[in-house]
Amino acid sequence: MNVSPRRPLFSRKPQSNIYRMFLWVVMILGGIWMLQQMNKGEIQPLFLPTPTPTRTTESYALEGDANFSAGKLDAAINAYREAVRVDPNNAQTWAKLARIQTYSSAFLITNPEKKTRLLEAIESSDRAIELAPDDSFAHAIRAFALDWNANENFYTTEEVQNYLRDAEQEALRALQLDNSNTLALAFYAEVLIDQQKWNQAEQNIKQALAQDDSLMDVHRIYAYVLETLGQYNLAISEYDKAIAIEPNFTFLYLRAGANYRRLALEIPNVEAARPVYEKSLEYFDRAVDINKQIGVKDPGPHLSIARTYSQLGEFFIAARNVQTALEYQPTNADIYGQLGIIYFRSRNYEGSIFSLKCSIRGCSGEESCQGRGLERCFPDLGENPVDVEGMAISPNKIVYYYIYGSVLSALRYCRNTSPACISREARWTRSFPDWSRSRFAH
């Protein structure tokens, strides 16, 4: 007997489906196509980091200009350095970097810092002219950088004259390429005043003002010409005009304040001169406030305040301002020297020894805190020991050496009576002529 197989009760017999096969083929072909597109870069894989757009030279330059106007010159320099990194063949960018580097040297304290920054400015301007030898703006900026390098605190008289000669040639070349270049006219006037060609300098800067009186540089240089000619009130007026254009450029406030202080010196009675001194302090205080607002720790305004109070005979507040400057730059040997001078003038001779020693010979550990006017270091209060490298002697720092030697000699500060120690004191007192006393008393 034949028995038929039983049909499955709960499962279907497997069978092929043409639609399912077609779907698999489409998916496989689609996957192959996607892999090919990914290899070509047409399609990006999922979950990749969001691409960051590449910044342009113009973007960095705009950032640099904004930082310059805000008074943040170091940030402006960094932005322009990024700009020339992105496009190293842009002559205008190199020239603008050189201009900011030159101005930024005015915010530095020590001669080596200033010299290094100014040499960087020359390098940037050289690069600009190398890229665009017939660009009037590049030659004008190079004249500016060369003129500010012509400083007898850095170089010999012969070297200074060489810098001034080269600066004059660059300014004339800029005017030859574009006789309507207002900046070139202004920088040429600045070179001429440094060459003591006063009448010619005044003619050129007035011509620059007639062409364009909207430039900070033009008013700054006119103020410089006027103060060199002893017209301090008019110089202050021009600095005020420059400040109106660049209100966060604290260097201008310091120059205007210094002119008020110079006017005060011409008044024989200190009390009669006090209102003029107070005007100078107003400018310095504004510079301090601007630096606080933009987060810049610049010792310059505090040192200007200290000099003003020192001239008024108010040595305690003068010393406090120098100590504030040292909080910003605790390893700056020049600031220790300025504190030592104030202690000396206030007859705190013992205190002046510690500060002047740090300035001249250098100091470290507890001595560095004593050099800042402290009894000892107080790490809990942020008064930590630092290493201070002594300064080399230079024409505008010789006062530190002179006074240090005088105090050591007067107080018999040798800890022993050895011939070597006594001989050292004698060398200190013989090293400087007597006429220096009256000169350094101011």
Features from the language model and the residues they span:
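Residue-level recognition of tetratricopeptide repeat
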Residues: 65, 99, 103-106, 144, ...
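TPR-repeat structural position
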Residues: 73-74, 107, 111, 118, ...
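Canonical tetratricopeptide repeat
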Residues: 96, 141, 187, 221, ...
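Alpha-helical segment of the N-proximal tetratricopeptide repeat
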Residues: 55-86, 103-114, 187, 194, ...
